[in-house]
Structure formats: structure tokens, C-alpha cells
């Protein structure tokens, strides 16, 4: 029985899941919007939101914790220089998940994962 067990296995080993979410979190922080399957998006939110909360207080210890969880210097740099200050007044809910239909190959539900309050480029006319 799996009562009270949190998290999805996503048909992967634990090491594969950890590596996948490290990479996905780093990509999310770098691009601020990524497209993935809906179950992965919902699990990514559980990884990304605590990292942004960590980035609100810029310290060497917090930077090391963030680097241990993403293994990306660029992601950590952006996290503490841009994203932490941007969400200073927000008490959580930094990630938005938007459903975007189904993948053509296997009909998997797809979703965009984006950071809220991200600067959107103006559409060129």
C-alpha cells in the first residue's frame, strides 16, 4: 500500500529522477519558461519553489545549498541576483503551470511551467 507517500516515480530510478529535476530546475531558472509533461511540471514545482525561497536571503551558505541542488553556476547566479530580489515581497507561489494540450506522439498531457511576474517581451509590430 502506498498510503501517505508523496511524490511521483515517473517510471524512473531515484537517481534518474533527481538528475532530471536538477536539470529541469536549472533550465527553468535560466529560461523562465519551459514546456514539459503535466506530471513532471507538478513535481518540478516542488523542487523549484523552495530554491527561490532560499534565494531571498543571499548568503554563501544558501548559494552552496542552491548549487548542490542544481549543479549549475549560471542558474545559481541568476537565482540570487535576479529571482531572489524579484520575489522578495511574495510569500510563495512563484511558479505557474499552464496546460497546453496533448503531445502528438503519445497523447501525453503537456504544460508550460513559468515563473510568475516574469518580464514579457513586447510583441514587435
UniProtKB/Swiss-Prot annotation:
It comes from the Bacteria. PANTHER family: LARGE RIBOSOMAL SUBUNIT PROTEIN BL17M, RIBOSOMAL PROTEIN L17. GO terms for cellular component: cytosolic large ribosomal subunit. The lineage of its organism: Bacteria, Pseudomonadati, Pseudomonadota, Gammaproteobacteria, Oceanospirillales. GO terms for molecular function: structural constituent of ribosome. The keyword ATP-binding does not apply. Part of the 50S ribosomal subunit. Contacts protein L32. Belongs to the bacterial ribosomal protein bL17 family. Pfam families: Ribosomal_L17 (PF01196). It comes from Marinomonas sp. (strain MWYL1). InterPro entries: Ribosomal_bL17, Ribosomal_bL17_CS, Ribosomal_bL17_sf. This is Large ribosomal subunit protein bL17. Keywords: Ribonucleoprotein, Ribosomal protein. SUPFAM superfamilies: Prokaryotic ribosomal protein L17 (SSF64263). The keyword Cytoplasm does not apply. GO terms for biological process: translation.
Amino acid at each position: 500500500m502506498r498510503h501517505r507517500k508523496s511524490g511521483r516515480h515517473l517510471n524512473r530510478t531515484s537517481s534518474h529522477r533527481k538528475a532530471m529535476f536538477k536539470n529541469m530546475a536549472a533550465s527553468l531558472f535560466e529560461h523562465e519558461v519551459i514546456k514539459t509533461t503535466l506530471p513532471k511540471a507538478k513535481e518540478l514545482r516542488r523542487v523549484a519553489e523552495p530554491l527561490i525561497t532560499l534565494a531571498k536571503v543571499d548568503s554563501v551558505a544558501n548559494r552552496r545549498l542552491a548549487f548542490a541542488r542544481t549543479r549549475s553556476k549560471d542558474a545559481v547566479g541568476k537565482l540570487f541576483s535576479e529571482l531572489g530580489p524579484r520575489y522578495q515581497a511574495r510569500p510563495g507561489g512563484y511558479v505557474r503551470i499552464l496546460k497546453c494540450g496533448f503531445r502528438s506522439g503519445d497523447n501525453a498531457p503537456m504544460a508550460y511551467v513559468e515563473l510568475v511576474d516574469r518580464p514579457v517581451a513586447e510583441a514587435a509590430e
